[in-house]
């Protein structure tokens, strides 16, 4: 494998805290990874496994030698055990409505074992080890009712209470006598990043967030989009050919000629949650604006260069028809009403097919009873077949879908992955991936999936699908044989693939921690999963 375009600091997301070991030889870096909300009119969370990480680094080495991905909530504080290779990780946050959710983890970085001293605990703001090896933590009250009976009590958001771990105690008792005001100021993440870079001997950490999309421009050139630019162009040896900056950030790369980048415009100061869309074309090495659309869109492209844009109608001010069909010149636009669209229910993402495709509910203003539809060049909508058998159960409602076009000896078809809806909380994730013929919806093969799909590509007789729990699936496109289904690691550290692009027997992958790697498809076929998954390095 040829891995390249790594951030200078590897294996980290957005840094939220930096904690140096008292001996000065190790640093723990707490970071957060983004959910798959890209572009803003597409969202998928099902089965997502990696949100927060504590990575350990040695001086002078920008790659982590160990990482803990067990945290389910933001990491607020860390403490090193005085004698053992163990770290106490305190985390939590306000749930936005009433509760202060928290967790406390003791992680052994040598063995990888994690222990939660408390089954239930409110948000842990600070923690430290006592001399006897127990953990002392300062936590928020359980909820906002803390100060309801006492007008003189400080607000729950300003209060910390002291608890200590003890054998057999699953839920700590909060003693009001230990209450103290939280006078700490929020940590300066930028300052922490600068101190970390200095400690590692790096001019800059080079973090850029997730790689949202990839595309091959030719056999020797790869394009990528992430939060720090509109588009990057790389040579296959990893050399940066060009970085295209401008208003906003790149979200999707549409495989047309010329290449089109769907970008998200900068936030409007008057409406900070507004995310309008812009289209840029790459011509003669320059990225130029060709179109702006009011609202949150997703776009897909046909083989002949037509684009279909679907606008999220979650905004009550934009419930009217906002879908748009663009010809190959991107100059002529036809306004369409394909029915209701929301970010969890109607994204499909099929590119490079002779036709354009969309999902439509039954009736069209619904998110239920979804059908795959062909959108013709004149704007006519042809309903093809239901995504799932309409048996009246909640599981027949498909969500968080992703698709790809395929045309081989079996004929034209589509591969679609998605999630079976469940109306109850806490059920195990149930997902699917199948191949169906385009004409009649005949199912060729099907597999259960562990999480929602982030990306799917078809190449060299293979279907390659990446999932939000970090799994990569290789499926024989014709027979449906499952050749590989394994979690992915790079250099021993777990990751999640958000972007895939294949060309000339090579697969480019983009990760949620900002890395891009190349692997030969022939090599990928031969990999066998170990207990820790497959390592692309």
Model-derived segments and spans:
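A short beta-strand motif characteristic of beta-propeller blades
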Residues: 2-9, 63-68, 113-118, 198-205, ...
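Beta-strand-rich domains and repeat architectures in extracellular enzymes and scaffolds
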Residues: 7-43, 49, 205-222
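Repeated scaffold domains used in trafficking and secretory/extracellular systems
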Residues: 13-19, 72-79, 120-128, 209-213, ...
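Hydrophobic beta-strand positions that form the internal "hydrophobic ladder"
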Residues: 27, 87, 135-136, 222, ...
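Residue-level signature of beta-propeller blades and closely related beta-rich strand-turn architectures
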Residues: 32-34, 92-94, 141-142, 228, ...
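Short, solvent-exposed loop/turn segments at conserved positions within beta-propeller repeat blades
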Residues: 36-51, 95-102, 145-157, 269-275, ...
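Short loop/turn segments that connect beta-strands within beta-propeller blades
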Residues: 58-61, 108-112, 165-166, 235-239, ...
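Blade-level signature of beta-propeller repeat domains, shared across WD40, Kelch, NHL, RCC1
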Residues: 149-166, 494-537
């Amino acid at each position: 494998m040829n891995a390249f375009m790594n951030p200078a600091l590897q294996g980290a997301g957005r840094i939220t805290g930096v904690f140096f070991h008292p001996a000065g030889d190790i640093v723990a870096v707490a970071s957060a990874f983004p959910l798959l909300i890209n572009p803003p009119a597409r969202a998928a969370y099902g089965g997502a496994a990696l949100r927060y990480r504590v990575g350990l680094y040695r001086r002078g080495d920008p790659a982590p030698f160990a990482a803990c991905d067990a945290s389910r909530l933001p990491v607020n504080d860390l403490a090193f055990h005085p004698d053992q290779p163990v770290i106490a990780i305190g985390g939590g946050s306000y749930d936005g409505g009433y509760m202060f959710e928290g967790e406390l983890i003791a992680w052994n970085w040598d063995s990888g074992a994690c222990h939660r001293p408390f089954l239930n605990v409110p948000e842990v703001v600070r923690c430290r080890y006592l001399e006897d090896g127990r953990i002392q933590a300062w936590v928020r009250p359980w909820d906002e009712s803390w100060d309801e009976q006492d007008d003189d009590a400080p607000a729950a958001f300003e209060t910390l209470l002291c608890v200590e771990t003890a054998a057999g105690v699953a839920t700590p008792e909060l003693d009001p006598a230990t209450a103290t005001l939280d006078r700490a100021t929020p940590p300066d993440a930028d300052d922490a990043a600068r101190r970390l870079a200095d400690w590692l001997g790096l001019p800059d950490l080079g973090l850029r967030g997730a790689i949202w999309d990839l595309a091959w421009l030719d056999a020797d050139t790869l394009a990528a989009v992430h939060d720090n630019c509109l588009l990057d162009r790389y040579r296959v040896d990893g050399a940066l050919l060009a970085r295209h900056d401008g208003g906003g950030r790149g979200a999707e790369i549409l495989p047309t000629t010329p290449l089109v980048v769907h970008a998200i415009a900068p936030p409007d100061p008057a409406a900070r949650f507004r995310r309008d869309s812009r289209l840029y074309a790459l011509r003669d090495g320059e990225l130029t604006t060709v179109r702006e659309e009011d609202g949150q869109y997703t776009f897909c492209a046909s083989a002949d260069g037509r684009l279909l844009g679907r606008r999220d109608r979650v905004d009550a001010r934009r419930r009217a028809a906002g879908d748009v069909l663009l010809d190959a010149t991107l100059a002529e636009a036809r306004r369409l009403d394909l029915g209701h669209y929301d970010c969890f229910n109607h994204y499909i993402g099929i590119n490079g097919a002779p036709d354009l495709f969309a999902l439509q509910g039954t009736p069209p203003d619904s998110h239920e009873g979804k059908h795959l539809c062909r959108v013709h060049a004149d704007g006519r909508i042809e309903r093809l077949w239901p995504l799932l058998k309409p048996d009246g159960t909640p599981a027949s409602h498909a969500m968080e879908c992703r698709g790809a076009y395929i045309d081989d000896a079996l004929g034209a078809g589509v591969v679609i992955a998605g999630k079976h809806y469940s109306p109850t909380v806490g059920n195990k994730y149930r997902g699917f991936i199948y191949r169906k013929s385009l004409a009649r919806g005949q199912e060729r093969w099907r597999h259960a999936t562990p999480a929602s799909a982030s990306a799917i590509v078809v190449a060299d007789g293979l279907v390659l699908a990446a999932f939000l729990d970090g799994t990569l699936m290789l499926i024989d496109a014709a027979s449906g044989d499952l050749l590989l289904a394994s979690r992915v690691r790079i250099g021993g550290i777990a990751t999640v693939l958000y972007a895939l692009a294949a060309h000339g027997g090579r697969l480019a992958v983009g990760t949620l921690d900002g890395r891009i790697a190349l692997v030969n498809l022939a090599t990928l076929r031969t990999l066998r999963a170990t207990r820790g998954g497959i390592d692309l390095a």
